[in-house]
Amino acid sequence: MSDMRRPIIAREGWPFVGALVALAVLALFVHWALGAVLAGLALFVMWFFRDPERPIPREDGLVVSPADGRVMFVREVEEPRFVGGRALLVSIFLSVFDVHINRSPVAGEVTYREYVPGKFLAAWDDTVGEVNERAYLGLVTDGGHRVLVSQVAGLLARRIVTWPAVGDRLDRGQRFGLIRFGSCTQVWLPADSEVLVRPGDRVVAGQTVIGRLPQ
């Protein structure tokens, strides 16, 4: 799957920015203050949909964060959907101030994809990964490791975008989608992986090393 240099503002944000700019121009004919407020909102939306370039770690076996945000928890759990047994779950909360572009935690082939409708609880709730609307993407690395990522909608984030199809290949740190306006991203690693982050740690998508796959 191609990941050539993308615009600094994700294309999914352009309709919002365009609408707000048009409204701001029209509002100037009503009152300058209203136009200024709408122009400010347009700038905020542009900032929200920012898509900066990131230096991707290249060492073999590393797992990078799939999202910007803060680690909510790290747990050993059963994951029957794709991993097929015990797995290490890392859950990351994204506030509205974080970059919302998701990046692949590992290099591998997309062999599983599923959308699950659900609720829209606040993304910092521990149960959101089980009850909220979410989209799963499963990757198999060249070493045969199975890694699962979930994009979880939140109270405000009610639009999940996932670009790859089954059969596509992703590089480590490659963009694969986004979630709009505050959300949660989760990643399941093989149970014998080494997790290198703790709850409360700040992580950066595609850049922060959150774990190491077993040899």
Swiss-Prot record:
It is a peripheral membrane protein. The modification Pyruvic acid (Ser) is found at S183. GO terms for cellular component: plasma membrane. Its cofactor is pyruvate. It catalyses: a 1,2-diacyl-sn-glycero-3-phospho-L-serine + H(+) = a 1,2-diacyl-sn-glycero-3-phosphoethanolamine + CO2. Binds 1 pyruvoyl group covalently per subunit. The active site is at S183. Keywords: Cell membrane, Decarboxylase, Lipid biosynthesis, Lipid metabolism, Lyase, Membrane, Phospholipid biosynthesis, Phospholipid metabolism, Pyruvate, Zymogen. GO terms for molecular function: phosphatidylserine decarboxylase activity. Its EC number is 4.1.1.65. Pathway: Phospholipid metabolism; phosphatidylethanolamine biosynthesis; phosphatidylethanolamine from CDP-diacylglycerol: step 2/2. It is found in: Cell membrane. One of its GO terms (biological process) is phosphatidylethanolamine biosynthetic process. InterPro entries: PS_Dcarbxylase (IPR003817), PSD-A (IPR033175). The keyword DNA damage does not apply. Is synthesized initially as an inactive proenzyme. Formation of the active enzyme involves a self-maturation process in which the active site pyruvoyl group is generated from an internal serine residue via an autocatalytic post-translational modification. Two non-identical subunits are generated from the proenzyme in this reaction, and the pyruvate is formed at the N-terminus of the alpha chain, which is derived from the carboxyl end of the proenzyme. It is an enzyme of class 4 (lyase). Pfam families: PS_Dcarbxylase. The record marks G182, S183 as: Cleavage (non-hydrolytic). Belongs to the phosphatidylserine decarboxylase family. PSD-A subfamily. HAMAP family: PS_decarb_PSD_A. Heterodimer of a large membrane-associated beta subunit and a small pyruvoyl-containing alpha subunit. Catalyzes the formation of phosphatidylethanolamine (PtdEtn) from phosphatidylserine (PtdSer). This is Phosphatidylserine decarboxylase proenzyme. It comes from Symbiobacterium thermophilum (strain DSM 24528 / JCM 14929 / IAM 14863 / T). The lineage of its organism: Bacteria, Bacillati, Bacillota, Clostridia, Eubacteriales.
